[in-house]
Regions:
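C-terminal motif of bacterial Sec signal peptides marking the signal peptidase cleavage site
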Residues: 13-16
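Residue signature of alpha-solenoid helical repeat architecture, marking inter-repeat boundaries
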Residues: 22-26, 65
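Bacterial signal peptide processing site
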Residues: 18-20
Length: 114
C-alpha cells in the first residue's frame, strides 16, 4: 500500500514537470522591441510593424488571443508613421478586446489630434 502511494506520488510529481504551452505567442518581440527602442530608425520600425502583424495574425498560444497592449502599441506606431486610419482601427480593436484600456486609448487619440 505504501509502495503504491509512493509510486503514484512520484508519477504526479513528474507529470507536473512537463512544459506548459504559453498563453500567448510572442515570436521575437523582445529582441525586436529592444532593437526598435535602441535604434528608432526606419529599419527597426519596419521590423517592429512586421512583428506586430505576425503576433496578431498567427497567435498560437493557449488563449488564441492577441496579448494585451499589442493592438494599442501597434496602433500607436501606425499613428506615428502617419497611417492614421489603420492606427485608429488597431486602437479600437484594443478597446474591443480589452475594454479596461478605453481610458488610456482615449488619451492617446486626444494626444494625436493636437
Amino acid at each position: 500500500m505504501k509502495k503504491t502511494i509512493f509510486i503514484i506520488a512520484i508519477i504526479v510529481c513528474l507529470a507536473s514537470c512537463t512544459n506548459q504551452k504559453p498563453l500567448y505567442s510572442w515570436y521575437n518581440y523582445n529582441n525586436v522591441s529592444y532593437n526598435y527602442l535602441k535604434n528608432a530608425d526606419e529599419q527597426s520600425t519596419q521590423q517592429m510593424i512586421e512583428t506586430y502583424q505576425k503576433i496578431i495574425e498567427k497567435q498560437k498560444g493557449t488563449r488564441q488571443a492577441v496579448p494585451p497592449g499589442i493592438y494599442a502599441d501597434y496602433g500607436f506606431l501606425l499613428l506615428q508613421a502617419n497611417r492614421e486610419e489603420e492606427g485608429k482601427a488597431m486602437l479600437m480593436k484594443e478597446i474591443a478586446l480589452y475594454p479596461e484600456s478605453k481610458i488610456f486609448i482615449d488619451r492617446i487619440l486626444k494626444m494625436m489630434e493636437k
